[in-house]
């Protein structure tokens, strides 16, 4: 039997935005396809495995109010919940949940696989053309051809992605994952301008190497909080986070390493994120701070 690769909507990229876009389109009753380079990395939590935070928590709950998946999946994968900014008025409170990143990805994939009108295809889009009948034709790296009335691009960091680890530069969308160079090329040929944005990813630490007796516990809230109005109870056991403060010895190590930092050796033309700076940025921006905190 010949596979029908004709859809009303095709979503390219299965990160958080792509998952919500594909789910929303399918629930509207249109034939939808979600194309991703790796089905095992759907809704991958690449950075800090958390949902919410100041301002972002309100957005996550608005997505839930509009019928999205993020809130329900977060509640299913949450291992610690906190309501931030409680020292301010209720309008400033912001929910945040630390999540099991593997559980989050698997739960999102399962929800999408059980959504009517939605199919998932693992491949890389290499070419997009618009025919005279206003139908888009997509070709993939592995030779498949798709047709769609509408295309939603949610490629995130994969469009001509470049990763920096110290002085080393490697093409890719995430560690050990290739960037989408072909798609970027054809978007530029279609007249779209490309630019480069920056994000940073914290290191992963083996918990077996941490002396927790020297750290301060950072516990979550014991009463049940949730992101989705649909969720009824916590699913996973709640875990502790930890805080630690740096000292003069650590600061000296960081200063010696500044020539290897892409933000400070000219490799990256950016000032970095405002509210989530790297530890070396804290050192440079706030030199008078003797013990800035770190969170594990």
Located regions from the model:
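Short hydrophobic core segments
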Residues: 12, 145-156
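Short, hydrophobic/aromatic-rich segments at coil-to-beta transitions
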Residues: 132-137
